[in-house]
Design a protein with these regions (language model features):
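Alpha-helical lid/collar subdomain of P-loop NTPases
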Residues: 1-4, 20-157
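Short regulatory helix/loop adjacent to the ATP-binding pocket of P-loop NTPases
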Residues: 7-21
Length: 157
């Protein structure tokens, strides 16, 4: 099984003599809503239909409204990774409601890759989709990692 998607960074086009050895198959665009819903169900979410709808809306809006930074990925690979993160958070923090778990996963997983210009837009989108919940959802913190970063920054000046 070989995919021909040279659009991702680091990939190159296959030469024509190698392309001729493979049978071409065409696939349609996947139904991201259905994939999200099923993955959320698989991770134990009861409100999977509603949360999947919010998830897909957010990623589509991010694709349309945020800058076209080359490191942004709002497609299936990023969706699946974020949903796995949400499942882990659900298991680690059973006291949080499902919408807060998904909000935390979306915020914490994506904020680090956003440019400063896109940060406010993204937070606004989250606030629109999860009204009034941002302040109630704790940030995942790694105190040991943060301490090491602070120490290194001080040492380097």
């Amino acid at each position: 099984y070989i995919t021909m998607n040279p659009g991702y960074a680091g990939r190159t086009e296959l030469p024509d003599n190698l392309k001729a050895l493979f049978r071409p198959v065409v696939m349609v665009t996947p139904d991201l809503g259905m994939i999200c819903e099923n993955m959320l169900m698989g991770e134990g979410f009861q409100m999977s239909k509603l949360l999947a709808r919010k998830f897909v809306i957010l990623y589509r809006l991010c694709q349309d409204l945020l800058s076209a930074a080359p490191h942004y990925d709002w497609k299936l690979r990023a969706i699946k990774t974020t949903l796995y993160v949400a499942g882990g958070l659900k298991r680690d923090q059973p006291h949080l409601t499902e919408d807060k778990v998904l909000l935390q996963a979306l915020r914490d997983f994506n904020l680090g890759k956003l440019t400063s210009d896109d940060h406010g837009i993204f937070m606004g989108l989250l606030n629109d989709l999860f009204p009034g919940m941002l302040a109630d959802v704790p940030r995942q913190r790694d105190d040991a990692f943060e301490a090491q970063i602070t120490k290194s920054a001080i040492e380097l000046g």
